Amino acid sequence: MRIILLGAPGTGKGTQGKFITEKYKIPQISTGDMLRESVVLKNKIGMIIKNIIEEGKLVSDEIVCHLIKNRIKKHDCINGFILDGFPRTIQQALYLSKKNIKIDYVLEFIIPHEYILERISGRRIHIQSGRIYHVKFKPPKIKDKDDLTGQTLITRKDDTKEGIKKRLEEYKKVHDPLVQYYIHEKKRGNIKFFQIDAMLSFSSIRKKLETILKK
């Protein structure tokens, strides 16, 4: 089962991806996590990525495709994987096709952009595990502490109002053409494409996902 998750920052696709991972035992490959891990390594490519992210721009297709190609070769992807945050552009989608990387499902999470600012600015992250909380919608049991480890939660540097607006502007430029590409692929019978209302409750979305992934 090979799945692509689409959706603007703050739609909750990462959280739902974790649910799919736990239920179907396939890894969730987050390009955001991969990019941040590269930055932490402080190697040549990591420093390039760091500068791009701090400017609020999107990392080039060449860099992201290189990271994805190496990741899906690993043994834990033998039964499938979830791509979270990839592809972001038509070029990245065509890269998958060119490399004969078969995708079964494309799931797009939809939410009005006016709600995204509130969702993202309230996010708190457990950096070691990737667990995501929200001060309003999904608060930790103890303020600013991870439920399982008790370690301190952080706010991403680019989760400021200015950073969020920049990311949404960049996202809009490439999102619509990408969705149209996958709608076309659905009509050709190459993939199964579904749009999901991300304003629904977590449990409602999960039930919907279970129904979709049985098809």
From Swiss-Prot:
Its EC number is 2.7.4.3. InterPro entries: Adenyl_kin_sub, Adenylat/UMP-CMP_kin, Adenylat_kinase_CS, Adenylate_kinase_lid-dom, P-loop_NTPase. Monomer. AMP binds at residues 31, 36, 57-59, 85-88, 92, 156, 167. GO terms for molecular function: adenylate kinase activity; ATP binding. ATP binds at residues 10-15, 123, 132-133, 200. Residues 30-59 are annotated as: NMP. It comes from Buchnera aphidicola subsp. Acyrthosiphon pisum (strain APS). It is found in: Cytoplasm. This is Adenylate kinase. It catalyses: AMP + ATP = 2 ADP. Residues 122-159 are annotated as: LID. Catalyzes the reversible transfer of the terminal phosphate group between ATP and AMP. Plays an important role in cellular energy homeostasis and in adenine nucleotide metabolism. Pathway: Purine metabolism; AMP biosynthesis via salvage pathway; AMP from ADP: step 1/1. Consists of three domains, a large central CORE domain and two small peripheral domains, NMPbind and LID, which undergo movements during catalysis. The LID domain closes over the site of phosphoryl transfer upon ATP binding. Assembling and dissambling the active center during each catalytic cycle provides an effective means to prevent ATP hydrolysis. GO terms for cellular component: cytoplasm. The gene is adk. Keywords: ATP-binding, Cytoplasm, Kinase, Nucleotide biosynthesis, Nucleotide-binding, Transferase. Belongs to the adenylate kinase family. The keyword ATP-binding applies. GO terms for biological process: AMP salvage. Signal peptide: none annotated. CDD domains: ADK.
